[in-house]
Amino acid sequence: MLTWVIRVCFLILGGTTGVFSLPALWVKLGIGHILLINNPYTDALIGALIFYLITFWAVKYVEAALNWLEEKLAKIAIATLIYGGLGLFVGLVIAFFASNALSQTNIPLLNSVVPVILTLVLGYLGFRIGISRRNEFGNFVNNRNAKKKTPEEEQTEEKSKKTYKILDTSVIIDGRIADILATGFLDGTVVIPLFVLAELQHIADSSDTLKRTRGRRGLDILNRIQKEDSIQVEMYEGDFEDTPEVDSKLVKLAKVMGGIVVTNDYNLNKVCEFQNVPVLNINDLANAVKPVVLPGEKMTVLMVKDGKEHNQGVAYLDDGTMIVVEDGRKFINETIQVEVTSVLQTSAGRMIFAKPS
């Protein structure tokens, strides 16, 4: 069906081209006075025939290009297409009025070449601005249409916005977020952006075995979260095409939605704090629920290896907390009692320093 549609379009294009182009050719060839040849019907027939013959070679390329375009458009959210189309329309309207003004001049370059360039450039810029700023336009329209709210309603709305929890790739692969959500410690709606899902799929398709395993684990965690009846899950289909990095997209999305980024990525945590974007690091939660260890407290540990500094030994608690023991190297593979001297607490984890008691 598509093949015949393409051929019909070529026939129409060929007939139109023949009507407007062939009369000048007949005059140059010296046969313009022959009415049987130089008439619109013959010109249209010859042009259509030539273009129809071209379709036997060109139709497969045109069909492949249309299929490629259809696949690309199918992956784009409808809101993106609408705002991109509106931006393109505005750009073309501006180019039309500018071209009309330039056509009044007697300078050949300004009234012929420049209007074409303006149409292409302004049309492209309008399309790109419409896509990249679609979220801001949407918020502007919503704010214009919104009725005047009371302070209580504004407070309730602000509170509901803060209930959006936007998951990043690292926290999904980690897996602990599924258990945290199931227990109800995090309220509100879980937002999973499509660009995060795409990154997970890319990791799951990796040739590296470790990456492939991590990606598939992340997809399994997402399926588990979606199947939980007590968890509200929303998919965000938009994208920020002017921003290639997923972390930067998450920060922008949190600003647009007024939500909170949930992560265990130390660098993303710092970026969110720098840009005043609310962020929850589940490593902070994990550290907060660990048993409190105070300086002077004694504990029994198994020395497993030597430390980085001279004569240091390293042991671990059951929850994985590292204990650095001064002068503990000589006790490797032995169970000894140590006394806590200090505790270092960060978002990356907790480290305990001790000495043999």
Curated annotation (Swiss-Prot):
Species in which this protein is naturally found: Listeria innocua serovar 6a (strain ATCC BAA-680 / CLIP 11262)
Write the signal peptide boundaries.
Answer: none
Swiss-Prot/TrEMBL cofactor(s) = Mg(2+)
Q: Which cysteines are joined by disulfide bonds?
A: none
Tell me one Pfam family matched here: PIN
**Enzyme Commission no:** 3.1.-.-
Binding sites annotated in the UniProt record for Mg(2+): D229, D247
Question: What does it do?
Answer: An RNase.
Q: Which domain of life is it from?
A: Bacteria
**Source lineage:** Bacteria, Bacillati, Bacillota, Bacilli, Bacillales
What sequence ranges are listed for the domain TRAM? 292-353
Note the SMART domains from the entry. Answer: PINc
Report the top EC class in one word.
hydrolase
**Which GO MF terms are attached to this record?**
metal ion binding; nuclease activity
Specify the PINc domain's residue ranges: 166-278
**Which family, according to UniProt?**
Belongs to the ycf81 family.
Record keywords, A-Z:
Hydrolase, Magnesium, Metal-binding, Nuclease
Question: What name goes with this protein?
Answer: Uncharacterized PIN and TRAM-domain containing protein Lin0266
